[in-house]
């Protein structure tokens, strides 16, 4: 094969030369880093992290090297946290030092260069947005105000399942349709005329961003060679389509009605955001812009659909596989909703055992087994080791929640363990952190989990269930697939049988 100066191989040669020279000139650090596996030149530990399920790979390495582990991912240093004690020390005791986000290339594109809550850097901007989220957009009072919306869409969800009575259906698809409908209604108030376009964009975006870390994230020195990636250009195109749709919706809303200065009980999320844009009721140093609003809406749609569908599917699997839990859930749900036409939000609040099942499922199958990476803002010490400024801090919450010293028989689905040992997953118990904790904990836990509980309650009230293809529950394939989250590699197929019409 003829070699030419336009060959990509030349870029690789340039990079290798640049990297070698840079490493030779780089002063040796005297910091005592946490223990970890031996590294190779150039790639660090990437050869040991290349498996399909990184949370399991990292746990195996942490079992050898300790719950605070250093790995080299290309040019980047990463500190891996793998037990509850280290999670508390790093994420709570040193919470301010690790309050920044590590922003990868894909995230930067999808968030208008780190706008919104998920990838914003720590400071006044993030503080203001989290206040809006926790006090107005996703507070307990606000989520309860959405119950009528959830109940309406639950009717459609149940009707959709009825159309499959006696026939196989894919649960993830049914759950996703319900979740897209509810998040669009809670954001925009009425049924969004562009909903179908938005759903297509979200699905395509999810597929393209399924592997969040790219070569340029691991080797920043190579970023100049990667900026013209086909995948990144496709992502930019999709985000521009979403931007056009959201901009039109915002402009139409502002033209159609005067934005209220006072908060209202029945206002949708867009109304809340526009009120903060126009009137800045919190008195912050700055007002949010249309770009902020669009970034927030997009992250809300992504978080409220994909991860919640995962939570619902895994919970359904675990309940069906455990005859004792299945019997108790059926009895509880049908006892509370006896002779009713529909399940209501206040019914769901009474379903204590079913909600324990959801909690236990998120322990075994967290939607994000590796919490969104943080970035260290300053050096700090843990047990004599230095967590260096600029390092990624990655919490393996799956490993934390599989610790046999905390959770007897950790891989066993046992909802009753929370009766014996009450703890919640809102971030104060470091043994159970499927949604993160502290300054970077997920502000939408209540909204997401409530929607999962609504769907499960409706499914167990209206239908009996069997596994498709004549399989027994214990024969369900639990193989995981890792992308934007941890999903079932083979989607759950069920056959519904109508009980309460």
UniProtKB/Swiss-Prot annotation:
Keywords: Glycoprotein, Heme, Iron, Membrane, Metal-binding, Monooxygenase, Oxidoreductase, Transmembrane, Transmembrane helix. It holds the Pfam family p450. GO terms for biological process: alkaloid biosynthetic process; indole alkaloid metabolic process. It is found in: Membrane. Glycans are attached at residue 60. It is an enzyme of class 1 (oxidoreductase). Its cofactor is heme. Its EC number is 1.14.19.80. One of its GO terms (molecular function) is iron ion binding. Disruption phenotype: Reduced levels of catharanthine, vindoline and ajmalicine, but accumulation of their precursor 19E-geissoschizine and its derivatives pericyclivine and perivine. It comes from the Eukaryota. Heme binds at residue 442. Pathway: Alkaloid biosynthesis. It is a single-pass membrane protein. Expressed in leaf epidermis. Also present in the leaf internal phloem-associated parenchyma (IPAP) inside the mesophyll. Belongs to the cytochrome P450 family. Component of the seco-iridoid and derivatives monoterpenoid indole alkaloids (MIAs, e.g. vincristine, quinine, and strychnine) biosynthesis pathway. Catalyzes the oxidation of 19E-geissoschizine to produce a short-lived MIA unstable intermediate which can be spontaneously converted into akuammicine or oxidized by Redox1 and Redox2 to produce stemmadenine and 16S/R-deshydroxymethylstemmadenine (16S/R-DHS). This is Geissoschizine oxidase. The lineage of its organism: Eukaryota, Viridiplantae, Streptophyta, Embryophyta, Tracheophyta. The gene is GO.
């Amino acid at each position: 094969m003829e070699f030419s100066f336009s060959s990509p191989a030349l870029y690789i040669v340039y990079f290798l030369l640049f990297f070698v020279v840079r490493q030779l000139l780089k002063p040796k650090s005297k910091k005592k880093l946490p223990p970890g596996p031996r590294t190779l030149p150039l790639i660090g530990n990437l050869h040991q992290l290349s498996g399909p399920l990184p949370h399991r790979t990292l746990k195996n390495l942490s079992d050898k090297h300790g719950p605070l582990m250093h790995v080299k991912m290309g040019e980047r240093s990463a500190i891996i946290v793998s037990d509850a004690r280290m999670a508390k020390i790093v994420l709570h005791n040193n919470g301010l030092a690790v309050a920044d986000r590590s922003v990868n290339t894909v995230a930067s594109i999808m968030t208008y260069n780190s706008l919104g809550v998920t990838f914003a850097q720590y400071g006044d901007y993030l503080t203001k947005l989290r206040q809006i989220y926790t006090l107005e957009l996703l507070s307990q009072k606000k989520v309860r105000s959405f119950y009528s919306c959830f109940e309406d869409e639950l009717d459609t969800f149940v009707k959709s399942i009825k159309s499959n009575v006696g026939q196989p259906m894919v649960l993830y698809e049914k759950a996703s349709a319900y979740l897209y409908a509810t998040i669009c209604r809670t954001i925009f108030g009425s049924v969004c005329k562009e909903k179908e376009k938005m759903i297509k964009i979200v699905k395509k975006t999810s597929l393209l961003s399924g592997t969040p870390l790219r070569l340029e994230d691991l080797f920043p020195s190579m970023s100049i060679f990667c900026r013209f990636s086909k995948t990144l250009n496709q992502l930019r195109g999709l985000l521009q389509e979403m931007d056009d749709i959201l901009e039109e919706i915002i402009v139409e809303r502002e033209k159609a009605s005067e934005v209220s200065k006072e908060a209202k009980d029945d206002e949708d999320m867009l109304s809340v955001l526009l009120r903060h844009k126009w009137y800045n009721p919190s008195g912050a140093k700055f007002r949010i812009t249309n770009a902020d609003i669009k970034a927030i809406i997009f992250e809300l749609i992504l978080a409220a659909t994909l991860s919640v569908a995962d939570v619902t599917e895994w919970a359904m699997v675990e309940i069906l596989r455990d005859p004792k839990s299945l019997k108790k859930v059926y009895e509880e749900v049908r006892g509370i909703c006896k002779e009713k036409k529909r399940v209501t939000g206040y019914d769901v609040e009474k379903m204590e055992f079913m909600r324990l099942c959801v909690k236990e499922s998120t322990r075994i199958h967290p939607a994000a087994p590796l919490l969104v990476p943080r970035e260290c803002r300053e050096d700090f010490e843990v047990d004599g080791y230095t967590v260096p400024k600029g390092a990624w801090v990655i919490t393996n919450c799956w490993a934390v929640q599989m610790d046999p010293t905390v959770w007897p028989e950790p891989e066993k689905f046992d909802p009753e363990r929370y009766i014996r040992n009450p703890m919640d997953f809102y971030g104060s118990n470091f043994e159970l952190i499927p949604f993160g904790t502290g300054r970077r904990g997920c502000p939408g836990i209540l909204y997401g989990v409530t929607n999962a509980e609504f769907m499960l309650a409706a499914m167990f009230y209206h239908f009996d269930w069997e596994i498709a293809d004549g399989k027994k529950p214990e024969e369900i394939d639990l193989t995981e697939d890792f992308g934007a989250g941890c999903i079932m590699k083979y989607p759950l197929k069920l056959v519904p049988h109508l009980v309460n019409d």
